[in-house]
Design a protein with these regions (language model features):
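A general structural signal for stabilizing positions within well-ordered secondary structure
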Residues: 1, 16, 77-78, 137, ...
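Single conserved hydrophobic/aromatic residue that forms the stacking wall/gate
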Residues: 1-7, 11
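Small/polar loops that bind or transfer phosphate-bearing groups
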Residues: 2, 29, 62-63, 89, ...
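Alpha-helix termination/capping residues and helix-transition junctions
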Residues: 4, 19, 80, 110, ...
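Conserved sugar-transfer catalytic core signal across GT-A, GT-B, and GT-C glycosyltransferases
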Residues: 6, 104, 176
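Active-site beta->alpha loop and helix N-cap motifs at the rims of alpha/beta catalytic domains
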Residues: 9-126
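Catalytic alpha/beta core domains of metabolic enzymes, predominantly
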Residues: 124-205
Length: 205
């Protein structure tokens, strides 16, 4: 269980990340250990961080679950707390049909008004959405951004080619971020920037 006494450490860390030049904050994602949290623990942490940051930069909590209903519940709570958007990993483990994945995001889009960043992680999900499939989701208005965790800068180039400025593309791997930026990535969202935020900001600039 997460102790309430840990809140001060969470706040100190978030302030350090902000002071290091972060353009935005993502919390309770993979690096934030959300897979081991209960729904209530996840809600508690996301609310604490959203309240602490207080719109100084956008906050994008990780709200993706295999269950569409749970994903919607967490995402609606993030919106109620004041998050600017949500980071949503695709349904994982059982590798659902692509039509079911799109419908998962369609139901989520119907439930919230804030930005939706799709977390495209082939390693954890066992499948990926292709650039053309992503384009179709963008054209339908289902997503606003993508965390592309392939570790392949060419994928970044393809996404920007097909979607242009309609999609915020975030490089989502710890390795080769410069190649991702050179391919057109709009930002870097991964574990490494959370550990070395000043380095990440310097690389971005």
């Amino acid at each position: 269980p997460i102790k309430s006494s840990a809140a001060s450490d969470v706040y100190k860390r978030q302030q350090w990340v902000l002071d290091s030049g972060a353009h935005s904050i993502s919390c309770v994602g993979s690096t934030g250990d959300n897979i081991s949290m209960s729904m209530e623990e996840q809600k508690m942490i996301m609310k604490s961080i959203i309240d602490f940051v207080d719109h100084r930069v956008p906050v994008y909590p990780g709200t993706g679950r295999y269950s569409t209903a749970q994903t919607i519940e967490l995402s609606k709570y993030a919106q109620e707390c004041g998050a600017e958007g949500v980071l949503v990993i695709m349904p994982y483990y059982l590798q659902p049909h692509k039509r079911a994945v799109v419908n998962h995001f369609r139901k989520l889009r119907e439930a919230i008004d804030i930005d939706i960043i799709l977390y495209n992680n082939p390693r954890f999900c066992g499948y990926e959405m292709t650039p053309l499939e992503i384009k179709a989701m963008v054209d339908e208005g289902l997503i606003n951004g993508i965390k592309a965790a392939h570790g392949d800068a060419n994928r970044i180039h393809e996404l920007k080619y097909y979607c242009g400025d309609k999609l915020t593309v975030l490089y989502g791997h710890d390795y080769a971020p410069m190649e991702g930026f050179l391919a057109g990535a709009d930002g870097w969202l991964s574990g490494m920037p959370a550990i070395f935020p000043k380095f990440a900001r310097t690389l971005f600039d």
